[in-house]
Regions:
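Conserved PLP-binding catalytic core of the aspartate aminotransferase-like
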Residues: 349, 353, 365-403, 426
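Conserved active-site segment immediately N-terminal to the catalytic lysine
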Residues: 260-274
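Active-site phosphate-binding strand-loop segment of PLP-dependent enzymes
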Residues: 194-255
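Active-site C-terminal subdomain of aminotransferase-like
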Residues: 271-374
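N-terminal "arm"/small-domain region of PLP-dependent enzymes with the aminotransferase-like
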Residues: 3-112, 317
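Conserved N-terminal alpha-helix of the aminotransferase class I/II PLP-enzyme fold
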Residues: 81, 92-147, 153-154, 167
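Conserved PLP-anchoring active-site segment centered on the Schiff-base-forming lysine
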Residues: 154-170
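PLP-dependent enzyme catalytic core of the Aspartate aminotransferase-like
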Residues: 2-46, 204-205, 340, 406, ...
């Protein structure tokens, strides 16, 4: 437990209480009682700051009753497989303070459309998003899953066939199911990599067996299970040859590496804000071409039979507006850093491979993902190393979690010493080296051979 981290949180919370004072007071000024409360609060903040300087005092434990303080990003190195890319930037955290209220983005909404709001510049952000992923139009959505759903709802009718990877995320299955479609999986083979040839073979199989072509192809650039890179350029080429729309699933790529949907051959690009764009959940992006925008971003045409009301400015597949407050503003606040960090993807891969090389020095450790690594998310196999220790340790598999936590490392699947995942994205070189050394030190402690 880091007392300084806890004191920073404590000071922030006291300042929030003072902020609430102004939210409750009349705009003309504070009453005598409110002024006294304010001054007491300032004194309290001062005492906390003094404790912060000295590194002493009682550490707070909770945000509020029943809600534990979350400090894993400040007090630990977090290697959770799904969290690093969504770690908020300082700008996003500051923006949440100002725009955390429910409909905060709607203060000056003049047209009833999220992507038309000019202050804050949500309209400009949408245009930048489309350019960022190399497409023509974009919308923010409540997570990548809602992007999948918008596309399947627009393109798929009952009985239509959709190709997905045998490593696809469950939300792709559900998006097809809701639309009434039928799933056919593309095999990833023994290397766990989807190729353009495998997609073409599956299309031909579907054509022979079903007598028709698939209506949509949905393939991820990097899967969530292995973090392997799939041949999306090859898939895009095959999709064009057969005239089948291609949805590029960039949940683990958009926001951490350069992505250009048109160069890939995608008709739709879906990204995750909370997974890879340093944004609050649920958030994401759906981008498409001028060809498909009128379909997936179509306007509403329904009207009430009594009132005659209609909502032509709303987009049905998105259920109108999507991210109305802190979610979209966190995406916007982080976006300048996100645009810069994708340029450093090669360095992230260097760090990922450095760690894996060090990790493999421990005899019995294996990497289940493709190697060398092409992503920061990796699946590792420690059956012949740490799991051997777990079999006789009184804490079983939790011994590794205990040892890592003692070294201020969290995020691995607690209790797992067989096959598990980790993600090194965003860690500094100092943290990467510390992480690598920590595993080696644990191995040596339990007399595992280190090469």
């Amino acid at each position: 437990m880091n007392i300084r981290v806890r004191k920073i949180y404590e000071a922030l919370f006291v300042l929030e209480d003072l902020r609430e004072l102004f939210r409750q007071a009349v705009p003309t000024g504070l009453t005598k009682e409110e002024e006294e409360y304010f001054l007491e609060g300032i004194i309290h903040v001062g005492s906390i700051i003094q404790e912060l300087k000295e590194g002493k005092g009682n550490p707070i434990q909770d945000v509020s009753a029943g809600l534990e303080l979350r400090t894993r990003e400040e007090e630990f190195i977090n290697i959770n497989p799904i969290q690093p890319g969504g770690r908020l930037t300082p700008e996003a955290r500051k923006t949440l303070i100002a725009y955390g209220d429910g409909y905060s983005v709607c203060d000056q909404c003049l047209e009833g459309r999220l992507d038309k709001i000019r202050k804050p510049p949500v309209d400009e952000f949408h245009a930048e998003l489309a350019e960022f992923v190399g497409m023509d139009e974009a919308r923010v959505v409540p997570g990548a899953r809602r992007g999948f759903q918008a596309v399947t709802s627009s393109l798929i009718e009952k009985g239509d066939i959709v190709l997905i990877s045998d490593l696809a995320h469950y939300t792709e299955f559900l998006a097809v199911e809701i639309a009434g479609g039928v799933i056919k999986e593309v095999p990833s083979g023994p290397k766990h990599i989807i190729t353009g040839d495998a997609v073409a073979d599956t299309i031909e199989r579907v054509k022979r067996e079903m007598g028709k072509l698939p209506k949509l192809i949905m393939i991820e650039h990097f899967d969530y299970s292995y973090g392997n890179e799939h041949e999306v350029y090859g898939v895009g080429k095959v999709a064009k040859e057969y005239g089948i729309p291609f949805l590029y699933n960039g949940a683990y790529s958009v926001g951490v590496m350069p992505v250009n949907g048109k160069q890939i051959g995608a008709d739709f690009v879906v990204g995750s804000g909370h997974k890879s764009m340093a944004a609050v959940a649920p958030s994401g992006v759906l981008a498409t071409t001028d060809e498909w925008a009128p379909t997936v971003f179509r306007s509403s045409h329904i009207a009430g039979d009594i009132s005659g009301r209609s909502f032509e400015n709303k987009e049905p597949e998105l259920m109108g507006c999507t991210l109305m407050g802190g979610t979209v503003l966190s995406m916007m606040a982080s976006f300048p850093r996100v645009k810069e960090r994708v340029k450093r993807w090669d360095e992230e891969l260097e760090k990922s491979n450095y760690f894996i090389r060090e990790f493999l020095r421990i005899e019995g450790n294996k990497v289940a993902s493709e190697y060398p690594r092409k992503h920061t998310l990796s699946k590792v196999n420690t059956r012949e190393s740490f799991d051997r220790i777990a079999k006789t340790h009184k804490r079983r598999g939790f011994f590794l979690s205990d040892e890592l936590k003692n070294k201020r490392i969290v995020g691995e699947f607690a209790g797992s010493t067989r096959v598990w995942k980790l993600n090194t994205y965003g860690l500094s070189w100092a943290r990467i080296k510390y992480l690598s050394e920590a595993f080696i030190e644990i191995a040596k402690k339990y007399e595992l051979t280190v090469r």
